[in-house]
Amino acid sequence: MHPDVIADLNALDTTLRTCESVVDVEELRRRIDELEHQAADPGLWNDQEHAQQVTSQLSHAQAELRRIVALRERLDEMPILYELAEDEGPDAVADADAERASLRDDIAAMEVKTMLSGEYDERDALINIRSGAGGIDAADWAEMLMRMYIRWAEKHDYGVEVYDTSYAEEAGLKSATFAIKGPYTYGTLSVEMGTHRLVRISPFDNQGRRQTSFAEVEVLPVVETTDHIEINENDIRVDVYRSSGPGGQSVNTTDSAVRLTHIPTGIVVTCQNEKSQLQNKVSAMRVLQAKLLAVKRQEERAEMDALKGDSGSSWGNQMRSYVLHPYQMVKDLRTEYEVNNPSAVLDGDIDGFLEAGIRWRMSENQSA
């Protein structure tokens, strides 16, 4: 093998060994054994919510183990691959180089995953998107962002559960709430929190003028029973109404949609995508619990910031700009990471932004 190839493989081995140490593969195997034992308990499904959490944790742990084991196998096979390729000729060597580049990207992604060590990072993600300034274009932009995150989830074989979509009168969404279910989706997507800005020629403007639109993205961890988020029923006002679709048209003949108002905090949650009022209420309660957990965490952070004399991060500020006209560029304003292919980004190709955001957050935390 060429000395440069040997040096690169040695560097990849060092990085992967660090990942294996951080993940603690043997502890992960023990955790899987423990969860499999719980999952085999005949009485597990007496508590369906707890059972779903156990099976979800087991699935996440198994996926993480498979991923890191597969990386080790691929890396260990690289010297053999190069040995065979050098016997076959330049085309085979080029294929080996391509596999090495792919492996390098995958190990880098695993390295980023090891940076997700927060208390809730391994949870599923609950995403709220709200259209901001920009009228009909902003509503359309909110819907484009929702599609972007769902496409990202699909590319990673993650599950998506839509709780609520509030459509605007002409086009697009006023707001949307949905969960992305997969290992570390909250930790990964939490760097998406903030204001997203779109600049383009408006498809809704007969004069073809350029329009700037804004949408706010909120990312929360999905609440589990261990979080002990208690909600007093007397603190909740429940309103029911008919589900509506695009243009405000009713899509249900019964009052199945649910709106919950948490009176002490003023938090309002709606859910209309389930088939029954009961299902919508259960889903709305999950979202409300996630929002109350976020309030609790925010209060705790404020107390810590006060002790440290730290003003804290302002996630409400603009964090990414998507320019479709007069040039094409998507740029993260925190990390400076940018690409000139907005179409791919809006189709869910956001891993580069996520990895850069996670590295940036770790750097910020270390310097705080």
Swiss-Prot record:
Keyword Protein biosynthesis: yes
A single cellular component GO annotation: cytoplasm
GO MF assignments: translation release factor activity, codon specific
Modified residues (N5-methylglutamine): 249
Posttranslational mods: Methylated by PrmC. Methylation increases the termination efficiency of RF2.
Pfam families: PCRF, RF-1
Keywords assigned: Cytoplasm, Methylation, Protein biosynthesis
Places the protein is found: Cytoplasm
SUPFAM superfamilies per record: Release factor
InterPro entries xrefs: PCRF (IPR005139), Pep_chain_release_fac_I (IPR000352), Pep_chain_release_fac_I_sf (IPR045853), PrfB (IPR004374)
Main subcellular location of this protein, as a coarse class: cytoplasm
Recorded family membership: Belongs to the prokaryotic/mitochondrial release factor family.
Matching HAMAP family: Rel_fac_2
Function as written in the Swiss-Prot or TrEMBL entry: Peptide chain release factor 2 directs the termination of translation in response to the peptide chain termination codons UGA and UAA.
Protein name, UniProt field: Peptide chain release factor 2
